[in-house]
UniProtKB/Swiss-Prot annotation:
It is linked to Combined oxidative phosphorylation deficiency 35: An autosomal recessive disorder caused by defective mitochondrial metabolism and deficiencies of mitochondrial respiratory enzyme complexes. Clinical manifestations include global developmental delay, intellectual disability, microcephaly, and early-onset seizures. NCBIfam families: miaA. This is tRNA dimethylallyltransferase. Residues 429-467 are annotated as: Disordered. The modification Phosphoserine is found at residues 443, 455. Residues 445-454 have a biased composition (Basic and acidic residues).
Length: 467
């Protein structure tokens, strides 16, 4: 149904009357701070489209500042979907839930002859809309509550126990997952329990479908128009630091205090706070944890130090997240292997003073080309796929007593400071052991005539053998 809706041919405006067009699914990628929401709003206004947010934190009610939601005024200018509809206390909302709801919305937007514009920073949410990459363990009409609850139950068990169980039913998937990655291990076990088919077998079937590839199944929509906003890293870092300052000026601390008081204070008092699930994963909340729980209980100087520490941590983690987002785009979009991979068009956003000519106008031209069925004049960005770099191999470092998943991660580990320190320590211990053996083997009075019984030279030979 999605492909049919996406390929719906509708009459164009009066300037091109008589022609036919195929409405595209517009997707805007980019790291945080590149202006994705701004471009989506502008395209939505110009093209009469509707915006579908693809942000795993913006689905929750609350924390509007820290999750950088569009304002109520902006939502009135252009209709937005998938924002602020999940209760903040819900901790088991998944990408499957997002995919099911957002796909239905996109089909509805197409059915009303409008252009859906998908925008957000959660790239695997966007992947779930573009490609067949997820596994349905239950019929959609039955809902996902029971399935999700089973995954939650599994996550309560010990990670090593879960991983051992997975290695018995799906050794191929177990070899790709770290025992500490409990959520993914639990998900793979859930797939097997609910279907009787291993997770890896499901993925193999997707990859071998017509249009599928090494990273997933075929495209779900026939005419995706993908735009990638990118900027010089130094410029983006500076912009992100300013964004944090702007958030603080907009009332970030008050928002965090209120949210902590309403939703998290009881958990902290019971030492059961969880920054791994739900909205509590949001960048910014855990960075101010110490400040929030000690505010009013310590000296002003200590409180100010914790506040400063939280602000600096927020700036650093935001910049790291931006780099992670760009790596994901390069690995999963720009260098994606497979027979049918949609083009990705890059838009340079380093100089915001040139936004109109460098970003908005080229974006409109690209989208209009898709609408009219023409190939854009802009050249898409394509990077070579490095199969070895993406290989999720299992490595065990006996020296550090660590499991490393991934060839790239393994290469980084053996060059890491911690591994090299362990290597030096091992060599030092080995050297000390050799010296000890040598000192024990050589008698203090070795220059004297041996008095032990035995044939001549026997003891000398034993000494030589032991050194």
């Amino acid at each position: 149904m999605a492909s049919v809706a996406a390929a719906r041919a509708v009459p164009v405006g009066s300037g091109l009357r008589g022609l036919q067009r195929t409405l595209p699914l517009v997707v805007i990628l980019g790291a945080t701070g590149t202006g994705k929401s701004t471009l989506a709003l502008q395209l939505g206004q110009r093209l009469g489209g509707e915006i579908v947010s693809a942000d795993s934190m913006q689905v929750y009610e609350g924390l509007d500042i820290i999750t950088n939601k569009v304002s109520a005024q902006e939502q009135r200018i252009c209709r937005h979907h998938m924002i602020s509809f999940v209760d903040p206390l819900v901790t088991n909302y998944t990408v499957v839930d997002f995919r099911n709801r957002a796909t239905a919305l996109i089909e509805d937007i197409f059915a009303r002859d409008k252009i859906p514009i998908v925008v957000g920073g959660t790239n695997y949410y966007i992947e779930s809309l573009l490609w067949k990459v997820l596994v349905n363990t239950k019929p959609q009409e039955m809902g996902t509550e029971k399935v999700i609850d089973r995954k939650v139950e599994l996550e309560k068990e010990d990670g090593l126990v879960l991983h051992k169980r997975l290695s018995q039913v799906d050794p191929e998937m177990a070899a790709k997952l770290h025992p500490h990655d409990k959520r993914k291990v639990a998900r793979s076990l859930q797939v097997f329990e609910e279907t009787g088919i291993s997770h890896s077998e499901f993925l193999h079937r997707q990859h071998t479908e017509e249009g599928g590839g090494p990273l997933g199944g075929p495209l779900k929509f026939s005419n995706p128009c993908i735009l990638w906003l990118h900027a010089d890293q130094a410029v983006l870092d500076e912009r992100l630091d300013k964004r944090v300052d702007d958030m603080l000026a907009a009332g970030l601390l008050e928002e965090l205090r209120d949210f902590h008081r309403r939703y998290n204070q009881k958990n902290v008092s019971e030492n059961s706070q969880d920054y791994q699930h739900g909205i509590f994963q949001s960048i910014g909340f855990k960075e101010f944890h110490e400040y929030l729980i000690t505010e009013g209980k310590c000296t002003l100087e200590t409180s100010n130090q914790l506040l400063k520490k939280g602000i600096e941590a927020l700036k650093q983690v935001t910049k790291r997240y931006a780099r992670k987002q760009n790596r994901w785009v390069k690995n999963r979009f720009l260098s994606r292997p497979g027979p049918i991979v949609p083009p990705v068009y890059g838009l340079e956003v380093s100089d915001v003073s040139k936004w109109e000519e460098s970003v908005l106008e080229p974006a409109l031209e690209i989208v209009q080309s898709f609408i009219q069925g023409h190939k854009p004049t802009a050249t898409p960005i394509k990077m070579p796929y490095n199969e070895a770099e993406n290989k999720r191999s299992y490595h065990l470092c006996d020296l550090c007593d660590r499991i490393i998943i991934g060839d790239r991660e393994w290469a980084a580990h053996i060059k890491s400071k911690s591994h090299l320190n362990q290597l030096k320590k091992r060599r030092r211990l080995d050297s000390d052991a050799v010296n000890t053996i040598e000192s024990q083997s050589v008698s203090p009075d070795h220059n004297k005539e041996p008095k032990e019984k035995g044939s001549p030279g026997q003891n000398d030979q034993e000494l030589k053998c032991s050194v």
